Every structure is written in structure tokens, then in C-alpha cells.
Regions:
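Bacterial N-terminal signal peptides
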Residues: 6-17
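A ligand-binding cleft/hinge motif common to bilobed small-molecule-binding domains
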Residues: 97-109, 163, 167-172, 195, ...
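Extracytoplasmic "Venus flytrap"
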Residues: 33-48, 70-73, 154-161
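Hinge/capping helix and adjacent helix->loop/strand transition within the periplasmic-binding protein
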Residues: 56-61, 80-91, 99-188, 192-197, ...
């Protein structure tokens, strides 16, 4: 009798073990996405939107929670995901697309290797714009060059378009901006412009045109776009020249044009979601595949369109390849990037 009970117990344990082995890894679990900016900015809004449609695309239908960890232009969040979070595919990060700048120039705060993040995907690629309050006395590049007092631009941190786009313009066109960093996110930077504390800021075209207060500001004429980074003019700002047009007009040297291409490659990273290095390959595949399905969900596409967002997803595989490409640059490029980033 005891043998039968023991055999039955063994069979039951093996059966349970087999069921557990067959159950999807993410079943009954919670994925946490750490957003490196404060609530209300473009990265935060995109991440929260994706998080609503992503779980049902992941085998096991896990919960997804979003946590804000602002600071250092997402440096704090990036370091946390890379070096503190377990590489189990349960903690991800939504970080700034240009953090590779900081690694290239050797900032001591960097505790990650850009190429070794687990790249999951991005819901969009971005083009940068630089916009001003309409009552600011700067209508052209020449106005900025001749100004007795440089324009005051709000910025979050060096890895954000709020900072690197005006700094690139300084380097390429010989301009001067008074860039004030430290804003936790785009919402706080916008508030400073609304109050008149700041006169300008860099932004992605999608966040500027696709959410408030940008949409209302454009409609009411409160702001104007001075310059944009896309290869062609955005139809929503047809009067604003592109950086490429201006470089052609001003006969910018080829070395500066190459620098612009490297810096503006950050736009391809878009709104990247990453994991720690060392996530098991099967979980990487699950996360990448499900992410691309989530951003292709008809309901998500409809929501993005309603919000005025430019849905242009980038796969984790493409982000991984781009990360390896941008991180290897010649010494002269790195020296100029140090000037851009103030090191």
C-alpha cells in the first residue's frame, strides 16, 4: 500500500513538474518597464500606451506595470536596468535614444555598454525640431548669431533632443544657446516655455506636433519652428528649413555633415525599450516578436493616429545592429562630440 502511495505521489509530482515546464514563462508574472523620464512626456506616454496592448501578445498574458525613474536624461534608469535589474526579461527600460553619446565621450556616470543592452524595439523613429516662442526675437540663424543675449532653451539632459539638437546647431553653424538642463521631462520644459522662463527647446516632431501643448501652440501661433532635422520639411511646418538645406546653403564642410549624421542617428533609435544584458535568447525572441505585434495591433494603431503620433516601429534586431554601428567612431568625431556635450 505504501509503495502505491509513494508511486502515486511521484507520478503526481512528475505531472505537476511537466505542467510547469509546459506553461509559458511569463504566465502569472509581471513585467516592469522603468521609464527614465517624469510622467507626462513623450517617452512616458508612448510607453504607457504600448503597455496596454502588449500583454495579450505575450504567451502567458503577464501584467505590465510602468514605473518612472527620472534623472540624468534617463542615465539613472539606464544604469539601473543594465547593472541592477536581473537579466530575466521581467525588468525593461524606456530610455533616451542618444545615451550612446555619453559612452562615446567617456562620461564617468555611464555604467553600461550601449551595444550589450537587450534591444526589444521602438514604436517610432523621430525627427527633431527646434521651436521658439513666437514673441522671441529670433527668426533666423543669423538672428541667433548676432544676438547680444543667446536664446534660453529648456532641456532635460544630454541624451535628449532637447539638448543635443541645439548643441549640434551650435557646432555646425557657429551659434550660441543658453541651454538650461535639469528638467525632469518634456512637460516641465514646456511649462517653463509657457511661463516665459525659457524661449525655446528641441523636441521630436512627433511629440511636438502630436500632443499638448504643442498642438495648441502651433494652432494659436504661440510658437514657431525655426529648424527641423528631417530629410524633407514636415508638412506641419512647411516654412521651417531642414538642417540639411541650411548646411547646403551655408556650404558646411563635409566633416560637419558627417557629424550631423552620427548625432541625428539617435532619431532612428526613437523611443527604445531595452533589457539587461544576458536575457535568455528564448525570452528575447518572445519580447521582440510580441512587441512588434503589439505596435501593429489595429486598436493601438487607431489610438496612435487619434493622438497624432507617428507610428514607425523599429525592431529589436535593427536597434541592436545600429547600436553596434554608432558606438565605433573615429577620434576626430569623438572630440567634436565632446564639444557638443560640454566635456
Amino acid at each position: 500500500m505504501l509503495k502505491k502511495i509513494a508511486f502515486g505521489l511521484l507520478f503526481f509530482l512528475l505531472w505537476v513538474s511537466n505542467l510547469q515546464a509546459q506553461a509559458p514563462f511569463y504566465q502569472g508574472k509581471t513585467i516592469r518597464i522603468v521609464v527614465g523620464f517624469a510622467p507626462g512626456g513623450a517617452v512616458d506616454l508612448w510607453t504607457r500606451a504600448v503597455a496596454r496592448y502588449w500583454p495579450k501578445r505575450i504567451p502567458g498574458n503577464p501584467d505590465i506595470v510602468v514605473q518612472n525613474m527620472p534623472g540624468g536624461g534617463t542615465m539613472i534608469a539606464a544604469n539601473y536596468v543594465y547593472g541592477v535589474a536581473k537579466p530575466d526579461g521581467l525588468t525593461l527600460g524606456a530610455i533616451a535614444p542618444a545615451l550612446y553619446f555619453d559612452q562615446l565621450i567617456g562620461r564617468k556616470e555611464v555604467q553600461f555598454d550601449w551595444t550589450k543592452f537587450t534591444w526589444i524595439g521602438s514604436p517610432e523613429q523621430i525627427d527633431e525640431v527646434l521651436f521658439f516662442r513666437a514673441d522671441a526675437p529670433y527668426k533666423t540663424l543669423e538672428d541667433i548669431r548676432k544676438a547680444a543675449e543667446p536664446p534660453r532653451c529648456a532641456a532635460t539632459g544630454p541624451a535628449s533632443a532637447t539638448y543635443y539638437f541645439p548643441k549640434l546647431l551650435e557646432e555646425v553653424f557657429g551659434l550660441k544657446f543658453n541651454i538650461v538642463t535639469g528638467y525632469p521631462g518634456g512637460a516641465e520644459a514646456d511649462l517653463a516655455i509657457q511661463k516665459g522662463e525659457m524661449q525655446c527647446r528641441g523636441a521630436s516632431s512627433s511629440s511636438f506636433f502630436g500632443r499638448e501643448p504643442g498642438r495648441t501652440w502651433v494652432k494659436t501661433g504661440f510658437v514657431r519652428v525655426l529648424i527641423q532635422a528631417g530629410s524633407t520639411r514636415d508638412a506641419r511646418a512647411p516654412e521651417a528649413p531642414t538642417i540639411w538645406e541650411l548646411m547646403e546653403k551655408e556650404k558646411t564642410p563635409e566633416a560637419s555633415r558627417r557629424l550631423a549624421k552620427i548625432v541625428l542617428a539617435a532619431g532612428v533609435f526613437g523611443r527604445p525599450i531595452v533589457g539587461a544584458p544576458g536575457v535568455p535568447p528564448d525570452r528575447i525572441k518572445i519580447l521582440r516578436d510580441s512587441f512588434m505585434k503589439a505596435v501593429d495591433d489595429p486598436e493601438f494603431v487607431a489610438e496612435a493616429k487619434k493622438r497624432g503620433w507617428e507610428l514607425n516601429p523599429v525592431s529589436g534586431e535593427k536597434l541592436e545592429a545600429l547600436a553596434k554601428e554608432v558606438i565605433v567612431q573615429p577620434a576626430e568625431v569623438i572630440e567634436r562630440m565632446k564639444r557638443i556635450l560640454g566635456k
